[in-house]
UniProtKB/Swiss-Prot annotation:
InterPro entries, per the entry: PurM-like_C_dom (IPR010918), PurM-like_C_sf (IPR036676), PurM-like_N (IPR016188), PurM-like_N_sf (IPR036921), PurM_cligase (IPR004733)
Pathway(s): Purine metabolism; IMP biosynthesis via de novo pathway; 5-amino-1-(5-phospho-D-ribosyl)imidazole from N(2)-formyl-N(1)-(5-phospho-D-ribosyl)glycinamide: step 2/2
Gene3D superfamilies, A to Z: PurM-like C-terminal domain, PurM-like, N-terminal domain
Record-level GO BP terms: 'de novo' IMP biosynthetic process; adenine biosynthetic process
GO cellular component: cytosol
UniProt cross-references to HAMAP family, sorted A to Z: AIRS (MF_00741)
Gene Ontology MF terms: ATP binding; phosphoribosylamine-glycine ligase activity; phosphoribosylformylglycinamidine cyclo-ligase activity
UniProt entry tagged with the keyword Secreted: no
Identification of the protein by name: Phosphoribosylformylglycinamidine cyclo-ligase
Family (UniProt): Belongs to the AIR synthase family.
């Protein structure tokens, strides 16, 4: 036996399944995408150990920082299974920045985490391009992130996403819910679709009912069902920020996991209760389809999905009509959906017979 045959195997990171060269190439490729999100306070250059942000250059005098992080849930699996990687990054940004704006904070910078078993640069670039698009829609800079190639952690072709965003609000201008009062009007801003919550139920229905996602939707023969389901989460930052700063909004609730019932109470002080009338807006064809396919009760709809409303505003009744008109002029679809009343902290959603396919008038309540 030769010395060469006796030589022990030489291990490397590449043999373990990690391609450092591919990771470096990805950083170089996505650099211009990050650069395109530059804004006052950040130049959005990638490659360092961290990203800098200059609050003074962003125009703040005595700011409070507000931080949030989130993911996209199993909507990512839809993107993977149907090669729809280009917009899932918008969802990632939306889930974070919409959570900041409800506290009165302007999103300033964003960092992403992309984890996979084997790095596919083509897919990763498409995902990051969507993240950059989301950052531009929100007015925040993509200043860094992490790409983790972890063999054995994910099935072939799978990946997961997480986002982290920091915003700022001048001291004393933050929204905490303490300005909400009895009699306040609740305005609802339309969602763009399912957004990023409830997809475990959506995917279960798709599997059990044998949906053909690459074919026209049963309720719309001009658009594929997958296009409805993968529609990115709406980003409300630019339309809401001017009215927050002018003091015209008392509270905001981002309608995510827990639906209308569980998210609105998060911004209410004790002793106040939100009443929402489901008759005040028309159920979308997509939501009606999901409900019918799953024989889902109205209460479960109100606790699982946004039901067509992605953001709820509490506003002074004297200003409600004017603010609704101004938001419509800013591009939002606005509904007057309810009121604030005295009562135990919580939310009640009501509907008449046939609303959300109910056989009789119904009411669903969450306390807490």
């Amino acid at each position: 036996m030769s010395d060469e045959q006796n030589k022990p195997e030489s291990y490397s990171y590449a043999k373990a399944g990690v391609n450092i060269a591919a990771g470096n190439a990805l950083v170089k490729a996505i650099g211009p995408l990050a650069k395109s999100t530059a804004r006052p306070g950040a130049d959005a250059e990638l490659g360092g150990f961290g990203g800098f942000f200059d609050l003074k250059a962003a125009g703040y005098n005595d700011p409070l920082l507000v931080a949030g992080n989130d993911g996209v849930g199993t909507k990512v699996k839809l993107a993977i299974d149907h090669d729809r990687h280009d917009q899932i990054g918008i969802d990632l940004v939306a889930m974070c920045v919409n959570d900041l704006i409800v506290q009165g904070a302007e999103p300033l910078f964003f960092l992403d985490y992309f984890a996979t078993g084997r790095l596919d640069n083509g897919v990763a670039e498409r995902v990051v391009a969507g993240i950059a698009d989301g950052c531009k829609l929100a007015g925040c800079a993509l200043i860094g992130g992490e790409t983790a190639e972890m063999p054995g952690m994910y099935a072939d072709g799978d990946y997961d996403l997480a986002g982290f965003c920091v915003g700022a609000v001048e001291r004393g201008e933050q929204l905490t819910g303490d300005r909400v009062a009895e009699g306040d009007v609740l305005l609802g801003l339309a969602s763009s679709g399912v957004h990023s919550n409830g997809y475990s139920l959506v995917r279960r229905l798709a599997a059990d009912k044998g949906w053909k996602l690459d074919r026209p939707a049963l309720f719309d023969n001009e658009r594929l069902l997958i296009d409805y389901l993968i529609e990115p989460t709406r980003i409300y930052v630019k339309s809401l920020l001017p009215f927050i700063r002018s003091g015209r909004i008392n509270a905001l609730a981002h309608i995510t996991g827990g639906g209308l019932l569980e998210n609105v109470p998060r911004v209410l002080p004790r002793g106040l209760h939100a009443r929402i009338d489901a008759d005040s807006w028309e159920q979308s064809r997509l939501m009606a389809f999901l409900q019918a396919q799953g024989n889902i009760e109205p209460e479960e709809m109100a606790r699982t999905f946004n039901c067509g409303i992605g953001m709820i505003l509490a506003v002074n009744p004297a200003q409600a009509d004017a603010l609704a008109a101004d938001l419509a002029a800013a591009g939002e679809t606005v509904y007057r959906v309810g009121t604030i009343v005295k009562g135990e902290k919580g939310c009640t959603v009501t509907g008449s017979a046939e609303t959300w396919s109910a056989r009789s008038a119904w009411e669903a309540t969450h306390i807490g």
